Design a protein with these regions (language model features):
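NTP-dependent nucleotidyl-transfer catalytic core
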Residues: 1-143
Length: 143
């Protein structure tokens, strides 16, 4: 199986780190609104890679995140560290809590994920479930 390696900018034969075992992580939605057709393209491409790996006999540990906190509006202006949290902004817009907004749009996303017959990741990880690990990772990067 050949894939485009964005690091080397070359089409290369896929070679797993461990024989027939692949870890695959894809970014999932930020659940402050309905997912766009452009977002669905990303998830469909991830599904294509996942199914291709399975077809070629790989055991795939597939993980997708759900961002339910901390996605700031400043990334639209080129500064991801500024602006308002998208979930807080949506909560004000809808007159709900950020938790309610995240739950509603997560359910909508998962329902449509199934309607599109996309392969479910082995693990769905919500950002709020991994804040401690994220802080530790940033600390390591800053060293």
């Amino acid at each position: 199986m050949k894939l485009f390696n964005s690091l080397t900018r070359q089409v290369e034969e896929f070679v797993p780190i461990a024989d027939k075992k692949v870890g695959m992580y894809t970014c999932g939605p930020t659940v402050y609104d309905y997912v766009t057709i452009g977002n669905w393209r990303t998830y469909t491409l991830g599904d294509l890679v996942y199914r291709s790996l399975k077809y070629f006999g790989y055991d795939v540990d597939y993980v997708m995140n759900i961002t339910d906190v901390g996605h700031l509006t400043g990334d639209n202006e080129g500064d991801a560290d500024t602006g308002e949290d998208r979930l807080e902004k949506a909560a004000k817009r809808e007159g709900k809590t950020a938790w309610d907004v995240a739950e509603y749009y997560t359910k909508d996303f998962l329902s449509n994920f199934d309607k599109l017959n996309l392969g479910h990741p082995k693990v769905w990880c919500k950002a709020t479930d991994h804040i401690k690990e994220q802080i530790e990772l940033v600390g390591e990067i800053e060293k």
